């Protein structure tokens, strides 16, 4: 499966989780309290991280692609970071960067260490 990835910085993680959960029609699949949340829909991989000083700014774009080998990142001509990764690679990046997520939307999708 291939999903478009968007990552944003937000001022208030809890308020943003409530807002984006309503907009996406589901709770986040992965949550690291006070720091990070991520939703996976059929076509979208959407994540937010609490960075009040950068609220509303784009962190990166990219693709979650199950056939991706590893985790790659490049910068386009406008200075936007683009990433390509498999679901497993992103899960490992989340754990390494933010910690082990809790409260998945679906128990079978729990990211485990």
Question: What residues fall within each predicted segment?
Answer:
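Vicinal oxygen chelate
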Residues: 3-11, 37-42, 51-113
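Short, low-complexity, polar/charged sequence segments that are solvent-exposed and flexible
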Residues: 25-27, 48-50, 58, 65-68, ...
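Flexible, glycine-rich phosphate/dinucleotide-binding loops
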Residues: 46, 55, 88-91
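N-terminal beta-strand motif that seeds the catalytic metal site of vicinal oxygen chelate
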Residues: 1-17, 59-61, 94-113
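Short acidic, gly/pro-rich beta-turn/loop elements at beta-sheet edges
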Residues: 16-18, 49, 56, 71, ...
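Core segments of cupin and vicinal oxygen chelate
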Residues: 1-2, 7-46
């Amino acid at each position: 499966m291939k999903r478009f990835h968007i990552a944003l910085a937000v001022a208030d993680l809890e308020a943003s989780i409530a807002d984006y959960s309503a907009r996406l029609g589901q709770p986040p699949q992965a949550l690291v309290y006070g720091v990070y949340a991520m939703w996976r829909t059929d076509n979208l991989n959407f994540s937010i991280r609490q960075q009040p000083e950068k609220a509303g700014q784009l962190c990166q774009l990219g693709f979650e692609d199950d056939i991706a080998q590893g985790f790659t990142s490049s910068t386009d001509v406008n200075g936007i970071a683009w990433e390509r990764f498999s679901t497993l690679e992103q899960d490992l990046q989340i754990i390494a960067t933010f910690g082990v997520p809790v409260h998945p939307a679906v128990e079978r999708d729990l990211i485990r260490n």
